[in-house]
Amino acid sequence: VIGKAEAAPLLLDGLRRLEYRGYDSAGIATLVNGRIERRRAEGKLVNLAAALAARPLPGVTGIGHTRWATHGAPTISNAHPHGTARVAVVHNGIIENHAELRAELEAAGQVFSTETDTETVAQLVDHLLKQGASPEEAAPAAFARLEGAYALALLFAGHSELLIGAQRGAPLAVGYGDAEMYLGSDALAMAPLTQQIAYLEDGDWVVVRRETASFFAAGAAVSRAKKVTSLTGAAIGKGNFRHFMEKEMHEQPVVIGDLLHRMVDAASQMPVLPALPFDLAKISHMTLSACGSGYYAALTGKFWLESISRVPVEADVASEFRYRAPPMRENGLGVLLSQSGETADTLAALRYMAAQGQNILSVVNVPESSIARASEAILDTIAGPEISVASTKAFTAQLTVLAVFALAVARARGALPDTEIARLTDALLELPAKAAEVLANDGTIHALAARIAEARDVLYLGRGACYPIALEGALKLKEISYIHAEGYAAGELKHGPIALIDKAVPVIAICPSGPLFEKTASNLQEAAARGGQIVVFSDPVGAAKLRAIAAATIVLPKIDPFAAPILYAIPVQMLAYHVAVLKGTDVDQPRNLAKSVTVE
């Protein structure tokens, strides 16, 4: 911030708006009478606020950061900002050649005080400043030496109206105020201060002064257009809910309904997509890629697209995809899924696909994000800000978008008659009401949670399009309750996982009635015969058939198998939530996790 009022309160508020991303320490630095002063704290922002209350930081120019540890433990000494008497730095990303640079700088007399890769940036700039370079000369010279991904903001002693930022592989934006200027990794942090945003492109650096921002790339001045952000500065609260996760689960009927209202023509019951710069009928194949829950949504989308649209589809974990260097056929479509639109591995997969000549479509919840801006077209999940680290409404929104997209592809390719597309669309249109019905069944799931909370290991099983929901259920349980859980395709049970089953291991089956039900029921019989505690998530027909072997049954509304993965995602979220609450974990910000993973 280069402000008119004290910077520290603005920085602290901005960090609060980024709190959802996950972090383990935080800090702020400002210029006080031309000197750099810092306040840092381990743990939550409340600790930093207490440090600022005890020792206030004046000054109208400053930088702030919430850190998710990569190099060095989450301690006060390793918290950002890092720096020297001449320069302070905050950094998202990883400096891959920090060890070589550190050795070189120590040999030149620079004295390091932390274990972090970020301090290398500060020491490199400091070394150049000591040799007589100006900040505007030292910063780009340092950036040219860095390898890896980064978004950087630098504060210089004696320069009260100067910030320098740089971006490579991690997001950074400039905000324009009234005789104030801002730098931020997320437009949401700047939303209360400005609606005028300019995004740095990969490899850019920027000199920010009180009323101007000068952008540079490859040593030359460039222009970067201001855009009006659609993000609001309104505070995001939990309302009457205990946690953001609980609130966001209960928002799912409305989110799904809003998406269907946007993506389905009310008169014809046909899917409607925004204008696309490529012809879906001529796409030769698709490659879906994402991380975490988004990858499980991609797996579900693969099932839908192949089975009803008859198009070859691959679904890949983004962090593995580009390192395989897969050959990609002409006229292919890459579909990238990311809630934040900033996931580093997914962005890298996008760039690989684009370099291979693929058309690029992204499914994102932030239409101004890096992934969205790098795409030819986007499908916006319009779920609104998701604050809890564990994805709920963004996940079911991704599924809903992919389901409608699959129907649109099927229609474009003539893979299904309109009558069948209308029938499947009708099944999707039942989701908002049936999702609300599932959420109203909270007491039954809470009772089940008391049993699951005692387990050390849990298995989730699913088949077909519900196999990824088993994976998602296991992920949800492990990430917020810290119980070891694994998801498997039900048919794979006898190929290894059955060795784990005994009376202490709950086996949770995502098992709606339909064409695949009997096969999954046979797998559950195998588990029950070995003492497994069978927990069935099914509709009234399926639940009745499995009641004899089930230790517990969660009965869901009957729904067409096409729409079942979206509906069945909700009770597995609810179960994980209640188990986590019973175990007393930090539901919204579980240990070691970050919401937006901007490092590879």
Predicted regions, residues:
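Glycine-rich phosphate-binding loops that contact phosphosugars or nucleotide phosphates
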Residues: 281-430, 510-554, 575
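Active-site phosphate/pyrophosphate-binding segments
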Residues: 252-256, 260-287, 356, 377-506, ...
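Generic C-terminus detector
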Residues: 533, 546, 559-600
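Glycine-rich oxoanion-binding loops at beta->alpha junctions
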Residues: 60-77, 262-278, 301-337, 343, ...
